Amino acid sequence: RLVGHEIADLNHLTHLIQGAMEKNSSAKAAVEIAIYDLWGQLYNAPLYRLLGGGDPVITTDITISVDYIDKMVADSMAAVERGFESLKIKVGKDIGVDIERVKAIYAAVEGRALLRLDANQGWTAKQAVYALQTLEDAGVRLELVEQPVKAHDLDGMKYITERVHTPVMADESVFGPMEVIELIRMRAADIVNIKLMKTGGLSNAIRIADIAAIYGVDCMIGCMLEGSISVAAAVHLAVAKSHAITKIDLDGPSLCAFNPVDG
């Protein structure tokens, strides 16, 4: 369906890509990234410039995977020594252990790195409120908590958002523009996580960032376990939409044993 169309007709091309099939967002993202790359080559300019961006310097966090508490503390301290100033701590299995591991990591890196929690839908709404209030009462200051409850549970997200000081971020709850509109309408989260592999590429990611900016909702740009090409596309988006995308979680390539592609 794309053969024979001009690369300059970008909006029409992305419309065709998004309408080509249901779901399959990663496949759509791969094709869109290639199209946007050709668009940049057509005008001999980096993508972030064509999208209106300025300073091309951003800083990512690094993920600390779930493990024994001592191992997570050691991994966190090693990440800080490598220069990372934001750590994304995986939680969401055992609520009591989660609280203790976060306290231990916070004590080890306080003043040197910010902590973000990612529960990966692992808590109930009441568990999340209990854990976050317990940490807040203990003096643990968190930058955010990511997707504490199941993706479909917007009422649970709203319940948490209304009861804790820690900003709540939606990840799996938001795949496209319609979900972010509903999330904002319900006031069910403070931050939205954009991932190109969820949105089906750059076109919907741009729409999400623009919608969020209109309503004063911050965004994070995130990734799956991805190689350098898709993460590079996300970097261009982050630079172009830096007024909306204020947090960066693009550590995917650093978590891969090797880069499967060149380019």
Go through the PLM ranges and name each one.
Residues M21, S25, I95, Q147, ...:
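Hydrophobic alpha-helical scaffolding
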Residues A8-H12, P46-L50, L142-P148, C223-M224:
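Flexible, glycine/charged-enriched surface loops at secondary-structure junctions
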Residues I33, L38, I89-V91, A119-N120, ...:
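Generic detector of well-ordered alpha-helical packing
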Residues G19, H152-M169, V174-G263:
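Shared catalytic-loop signature of beta/alpha-barrel
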